């Protein structure tokens, strides 16, 4: 039996408001649980696919700077 994690995450947050999405993201990060990482990855994938080139560049700069700390 195959489990579609991407589909499950998207179904779970589909239709959420910005506040609900923020709560989901903050909760996942603050919990520090490894099991939350795939869900955050799916959300990042949505952001990346919907970002223009300038937004992608800005995200990469932010990521690069964050990894230097």
Curated annotation (Swiss-Prot):
The keyword rRNA-binding does not apply. Induction: Expressed only in the forespore compartment of sporulating cells. One of its GO terms (biological process) is sporulation resulting in formation of a cellular spore. Keywords: Sporulation. It is found in: Spore core. Belongs to the SspI family. This is Small, acid-soluble spore protein I. It comes from Bacillus anthracis.
């Amino acid at each position: 039996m195959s489990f579609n994690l991407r589909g499950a995450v998207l179904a779970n947050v589909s239709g959420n408001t910005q506040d609900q999405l923020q709560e989901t993201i903050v909760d996942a990060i603050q919990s520090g649980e490894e099991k939350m990482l795939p869900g955050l990855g799916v959300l990042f994938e949505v952001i990346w696919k919907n970002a223009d080139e300038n937004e992608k560049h800005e995200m990469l700069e932010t990521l690069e700077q964050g990894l230097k700390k």
